[in-house]
Amino acid sequence: MSHIQIPPGLTELLQGYTVEVLRQQPPDLVDFAVEYFTRLREARRQESDSFIAPPTTFHAQESSGVPVIEEDGESESDSDDEDLEVPIPSKFTRRVSVCAETFNPDEEEDNDPRVVHPKTDEQRCRLQEACKDILLFKNLDQEQLSQVLDAMFEKIVKTDEHVIDQGDDGDNFYVIERGTYDILVTKDNQTRSVGQYDNRGSFGELALMYNTPRAATIVATSDGSLWGLDRVTFRRIIVKNNAKKRKMFESFIESVPLFKSLEMSERMKIVDVIGEKIYKDGERIITQGEKADSFYIIESGEVSILIRSKTKTNKNGGNQEVEIAHCHKGQYFGELALVTNKPRAASAYAVGDVKCLVMDVQAFERLLGPCMDIMKRNISHYEEQLVKMFGSNLDLLDPGQ
C-alpha cells in the first residue's frame, strides 16, 4: 500500500474544529460542522483585514450598571443590547508566532511537567472563589481542577495597565478576581471599546486555543487582581483532557448493552450531551416519589436500588426501604420514571464511591427513542422482582404512595 500523504493544513483545520466542539458542546456535530466550516470559508474570502472563524459573539450585559462581556450567550440577565462581535485574527492573513508550540489533543502527556506556583491558604481560597463560575472549568473533574489551580499565578494590576494587547502572541489565560477592565478593538486604525469586565469573568483563551494573535486589548480601568494560567498548561489540561474524556465517554457508551442497537452517529450524540457526577458512599442519588429529571449510567462503582415497604417499618416508625436491585458498571437506572412520566418508583444509593454519566430528561426523550422498547420491557421485570420480594404485585406506576 502506498504511503498516504496528509494534506498541508489538514491537522490544524481539524484541531480548530475539535477545540470549538469541546468549547461549545453542540448537540449535533454534523450541523455544527456545516456552520463552522461555512463561516471559515466566508472568512477566507474577505479582504486581508478580515478575521477568521469561528467568530465568537460577545453579548453586552448589564451588571450593577456596568456592561459586562460574556461569551457565547452565557448571560446572567436578559438583555436587548446588540451583539458585539470581537474579531479573531486570521492565521491565514497574519504570521503566527514562531515560538507557539504545535498542539495535538491526542498526543500523550505523561512526560509533561506539571507547573506549580505555591500559594498560601488565603490565596488558594481567593483563587477558588474567583474560578467557581468560569465556564471553561465547568467540565473539569476534581483532579484536573486541582492541577489548574496549582498552575495559576497571581498578577496585581494598576489603573491604565495593559494586560494584553491586540496583535500580540497569546501567553496566558486570565481569571478576574477584582477590578474593572475595558475591552478595546482596533480596526482600520480606529480603536473602540466593545465592552467591560466588572470584577468577574475571564479572558485570553481564544489566542491560546487557536494559536492566533490577541483579538483585543484589555486595559485596567481600576487597580485589580488577576489569576493567570500559562499557555502550555491551559492547552494540556483543559483542551487535551477534555478531548481524552470525550474519547473515554465514546468507548464507554459503545460498551453499554442498551445502546448496542444505536447507530454510531446516535451514540455520538449521546456523548455530546452526557455529564459526569461523582457520589460518595451512602449518598442518595435519586429519591422515591420525587419528580424525575435525569437518567443515569454507572461508569464505575455500584448502586443499590431500594423501595419503601408497605409492610415493614424502620426504627423510627416509617416505611423501611428494601433493596430490589443492585447495579454495576455499565448498567443504568432512573429510566422508569422518564418512560412512564411518573415520580421516581425507587431510591438509589451509592455503594462505595460511584461515578455516573448523567443525561437530562430533554436529551433522554430526544435521543433514546430507539431504546424505549427495551426500557419499557424492564417495567414488567421490575414487577416480577417485587412479587418475589413482597408476595404481591405492587403498582410501580404509582410510586408516591
UniProtKB/Swiss-Prot annotation:
PTM note: Phosphorylated by the activated catalytic chain.
A Gene Ontology term for the protein's cellular component: germinal vesicle
List of residues that carry N-acetylserine: 2
Species for this entry: Rattus norvegicus
Pfam families for this protein: cNMP_binding (PF00027), RIIa (PF02197)
Binding-site residues, 3',5'-cyclic AMP 2: 258-401
Modified residues (Phosphoserine): 48, 75, 77, 97, 347, 392
Region described as Disordered: spans on this chain: 55-85
Lineage: Eukaryota, Metazoa, Chordata, Craniata, Vertebrata
Keywords: Acetylation, cAMP, cAMP-binding, Cell membrane, Cytoplasm, Membrane, Nucleotide-binding, Phosphoprotein, Repeat
Oligomeric and partner information: The inactive form of the enzyme is composed of two regulatory chains and two catalytic chains. Activation by cAMP produces two active catalytic monomers and a regulatory dimer that binds four cAMP molecules. Interacts with AKAP4 and CBFA2T3. Interacts with the phosphorylated form of PJA2. Interacts with MYRIP; his interaction may link PKA to components of the exocytosis machinery, thus facilitating exocytosis, including insulin release. Forms a complex composed of PRKAR2A, GSK3B and GSKIP through GSKIP interaction; facilitates PKA-induced phosphorylation and regulates GSK3B activity.
PROSITE patterns, alphabetized: CNMP_BINDING_1, CNMP_BINDING_2, CNMP_BINDING_3
Record's compositionally biased regions (Acidic residues): 69-85
Protein name: cAMP-dependent protein kinase type II-alpha regulatory subunit
Expression sites (tissue/organ): Four types of regulatory chains are found: I-alpha, I-beta, II-alpha, and II-beta. Their expression varies among tissues and is in some cases constitutive and in others inducible.
List of residues that carry Phosphothreonine: 212
Function: Regulatory subunit of the cAMP-dependent protein kinases involved in cAMP signaling in cells. Type II regulatory chains mediate membrane association by binding to anchoring proteins, including the MAP2 kinase.
InterPro entries: cAMP-dep_PK_reg_su-like, cAMP_dep_PK_reg_su, cAMP_dep_PK_reg_su_I/II_a/b, cNMP-bd_CS, cNMP-bd_dom, cNMP-bd_dom_sf, RmlC-like_jellyroll
PANTHER family reported in the protein's UniProt record: CAMP-DEPENDENT PROTEIN KINASE REGULATORY CHAIN, CAMP-DEPENDENT PROTEIN KINASE TYPE II-ALPHA REGULATORY SUBUNIT
